[in-house]
């Protein structure tokens, strides 16, 4: 396995670790509605950071974006909006299925759809089946899916042991939402594929290969921001128990506390895709679809490890922890299989 591929896998791991930890600052926000908290964090992660970093990277910010036709930018934006819809459905999936089953089904579907649809759309899937390296990477995707399933089972055992139940368990509604979440969340993978002309243009301007994907985030995350912020603002305006004005009428120290924590959560959320771009740049072009598989499987892996570190599994008993550990090992094995496949 080459150093470039190894570093690509490593950066995807770092990005996934940030994704697994980003919600920790949000949990310390006090006396704010979820909608206000999510909006503040989202403005940082989806608008401020993508624009600021792109302004630093590009020699002429406006000239870069105006150089693309609407036919180039619109698919990138719409796939970003598609991902935004999946982001909202994610929370509803947890509500009706519970954390473990919801995450397992949603992540499993988005891993498959986001990973395999790109080569199918590009007409490269037959190449993967007919080459040794391609078959090896597909095997890695299958093993990763098995690992996600094992971790999901560990979560179910934990919830059963600790008496944790879904907020409003509804299998039919939850499964529909989980499938929708999985499919729509893959929009980020499709957006990255659609944004290749933007990456190439950034490279032509002399942007470092590690950073060429970052300017496209202005468009991708702009699409996601409109969906997420629109959802939050509509709820803040229509739901009687929610009030943006009330949330910002608290004591100034508490407002500052909440804004800083929400901004930190937004920063950590953004960093997952900052390092995703670094990892994506190191993956061989013919296997760039694997970036999504690495990100999602490592997200599950890091989520399990973070849960252990935060002692969330302390009262779950030995069996759930053993199953979780097995699932984490399987995901690590999957990453190595994919790495070997890409090297071939």
UniProtKB/Swiss-Prot annotation:
Q: Which reaction does it catalyse?
A: L-rhamnopyranose(in) + H(+)(in) = L-rhamnopyranose(out) + H(+)(out)
Q: What is its main location?
A: membrane
Where are its TM segments located? 4-24, 38-58, 68-88, 101-121, 137-157, 175-195, 214-234, 259-279, 290-310, 323-343
Transmembrane is among the record's keywords = yes
A Gene Ontology cellular-component term = plasma membrane
Task: Give the membrane topology.
Answer: Multi-pass membrane protein
In which compartments does the protein localize?
Cell inner membrane
Keyword Transit peptide recorded: no
Record keywords: Cell inner membrane, Cell membrane, Membrane, Sugar transport, Symport, Transmembrane, Transmembrane helix, Transport
Stored InterPro entries: L-rhamnose-proton_sym_RhaT
One MF term in GO for this entry?
symporter activity
**Which function does this protein serve?**
Uptake of L-rhamnose across the cytoplasmic membrane with the concomitant transport of protons into the cell (symport system).
**HAMAP family referenced in this protein's UniProt entry, alphabetically:** RhaT
Which protein family is it in?
Belongs to the L-rhamnose transporter (TC 2.A.7.6) family.
Q: What is this protein called?
A: L-rhamnose-proton symporter
Q: Taxonomic lineage per UniProt?
A: Bacteria, Pseudomonadati, Pseudomonadota, Gammaproteobacteria, Enterobacterales
